[in-house]
Amino acid sequence: GAILPPLIAAFASDTRIEDAVKGIFTPQPVPDGYIDHIGAPLTIRPVNFRANARQVASLRPHIVDMAPRYGAEFTMPLEILHGDLDATVPLDIHSIPLRDAVPHARLTVLEGVGHMPHHASPTLVIDAIDRIAATAGLR
């Protein structure tokens, strides 16, 4: 509603923002300077908070609508990298079903990694990009 975002913004603290970002990175540490670099405090401005809440609230219905088409419509090379300790989007919620729906998909489960594999395992992410490029004939 119209009242909740300003209230949340008024009572949000730097500590709450830091805790939220830490939760996204867990179990890896947040890189030095990351919170300032991405402008994390901007997320609690009422207009931004409201927009994000709307997007999150509408995400699941869109995924439910799209998921049955994954196997037929994903004809491009598909690499999925997912941390086994991702508490934001657990492995069995999206990546395993996506891999199962798309016969040519490759799922790499990163042990001990949370929601930010591109920070935790950048070399493996680059390797996946290189595999996709090679499969697509771009290398």
PLM regions and their residue ranges:
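Catalytic active-site module of serine/aspartate enzymes centered on a nucleophile-bearing elbow/loop
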Residues: V102-R139
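Conserved serine/cysteine hydrolase catalytic core
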Residues: D32, A40-I96
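Non-transmembrane alpha-helical segments in soluble domains
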Residues: I17-K22, A53, R99, I126, ...
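Secondary-structure transition/hinge residues
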Residues: Q28-P29, R60, V64, A133, ...
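Alpha-helix C-cap/termination motif
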Residues: I3-P5, E73, D100-A101, T135
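Active-site-adjacent alpha-helix of alpha/beta-hydrolase-fold enzymes
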Residues: I93-A105
